[in-house]
Each structure stands twice: as structure tokens, then as C-alpha cells.
Amino acid sequence: MKTKRLVLLSGLSGIGKSRIVQLYAKALGAESNLNFISVSPSWTDDTDLLGFPDTLNNVYRPGDSGLVNTLIKASNDQDNIYIICFDEMNLARVEHYFSQFLSVLEMEDRKILKLYNSDLEHRFYNSEQYPSQIKIGQNILFVGTVNVDETTYHFSDKVLDRSNVIELEIKEFSELLEFGKQKNIEKLKTIREQIGEFPITATTFNSFSNNDREMALSKSDLELLWEIHKVLQKASKKFGIGTRVVKHIDQYLKNIPEGAPITKEDGIDLQIAQRVLTKLRGVEEVMRELVGNYDEQTKTVTGSLLIEKLDNSNYNFTRSKKMIEQKAKELSHNGFAI
């Protein structure tokens, strides 16, 4: 979230994706500024989300989602954090209804969302309430929850290039006994005391981010990413690792807090799984050399060029290899990987 990219939480229905967003907002003291938007399967373009200019009646009509009102409120309240969560984000095609946001979120500084032509502003009766442009400030965080089943759409590369996909796993049910115990509550209180303020302001939250120009990725890390890119490109020209993704991976690594349970090795592993492997899907002819052959008897994968490249590194890449293994298994069972 600190990297200001779109964060997508993926996992089984009922695993707690929406709850995590609620708890994150609670931890920041931003519960009242959390807007849950339920995505409709009928959405086809950004007017369903944002609204549209009614030139017949000379007014701007915002969408029923309440997104525009939240963005305007956040723009006029830069001191406080606002979180916008798109629930079941892939019930409709994200690149259709979210197209303008995908472009705006990629801008580093001047993030401007256009609602309508500025020439119409003097004509609209409610232009003071709904101006033609809204500035997306550093106090707004975007997150989406995702279910992967027959009722949803796959994300396009355009979406995946601009987001972090975090796949949630189910903990053993016996661990539920530990949740909510006093030690966890006390730990949260201690963190709040260390920060020294509550609710946490946007300025304080942004100060957590590390925006140093010096790269966290080492030369050997970059060489590994380049080798993976070449292998992907050889399989298909639509696969690969763009410069944008490399920069985002570097920014992610720079923002791992000191003393965190996640190490740099874990971070690179997570980022390859979240930013690179999520885009790999296709038929056997394209995918076989990349993910290898899955053996049902031994439950292992052989002949994977991607695993071969990862094995040449000093890192373990546990998550990435597990994801490649899953895709090899899908390929073996279905003739394609998703």
C-alpha cells in the first residue's frame, strides 16, 4: 500500500479479503473514510463508475458508487487518509470501467481525473460541487478484492502491470484459537504508541514510504530479472518484464521496513510471483517449456526453464516455484494454464 499502486487481494470466497481491508483502515484510524464499492457485472465503461455529464439538463450526474463524492472529499481533506475498495473487482472487465484510473494511477505527481470537458463547467449548475477535474492526492489508497471462478473475468496485462496481486492462503483452522488474544491487541497498542498519533495522518503515512533514488535491486538481481525476461520473450512476445515492473519491484523492496518478518529474499520472491508469474497463462505449446512437466506420481516438476533460472540464483524462491508448479499442474490436467 505504501508504494501507492493498486493492490489486489485474491483468494477463495470467504477467506477474509474484505475483512483485511477493514482492519487496515481501522489500524490507520480511517474507518470513516473507507468506501466499499460493490462492482456490478453490468459495468461496461467508466460512466458506470464515475457518472456522466447530462448536457440536456446542464448537470453532472455522479455514479451510484459514491466514488466521485469520496474523491472530492479526499481532495478537500488532504490531511486524512481515504481508502477506496472495489469489492469483487473482476465481476466486470476492469480495463473497461477502470480505464481512466489505470492511466491516472501510473502518473507520479500530477494525478488528475477528468469527469467531463472543462468547457462545460460554466454551463453546469452543479459544477462547484462536481468540477470537471479532480486531483487524486497522496492521501488516497486503492485496493480491490478478487475472486477467481466461472463468474469473473481474468485481468489483462494492462491491469496486472500496474498492480500488486496478493494471493491469500487459508491458515490451519486450529490457528483461529490464537486470533483476538490479548497479546495481539497489546501489540497494536504498542505500534500506535511508537507512531505517536492516532488516527494516522496522510503526512505521517506518506513519511513511511522510502522514495530514495538509489536502487534496492542489486546488479545480480537485475541480471536475474533480465534472464527471466529473455526466457519469457522466447516463449511468446506477449510475455516479459517491462521497465515499469522492474521499477515497481524496486520500490516494493525499498519499502520493506527494517526488522520486518519479510526479508529482501522474501520480497523478490513475492514480487516475481505477484508481478511476473500472474501474467503467465496460455496453451501447452506456449507454456510447456516455461513451467515444465508435472509428474503426478512424484508431485514434482521437471524441465522448467523458469525454475532453472531461479535455481541459478542465491535465493530460494519458494513461492515463485510453488506458483510455477501449480501452472504446470494446470497444464497437465487441462492443456492450458490460467
Locations of the language-model features?
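C-terminal regulatory/interaction module of P-loop NTP-utilizing enzymes
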Residues: 1-338
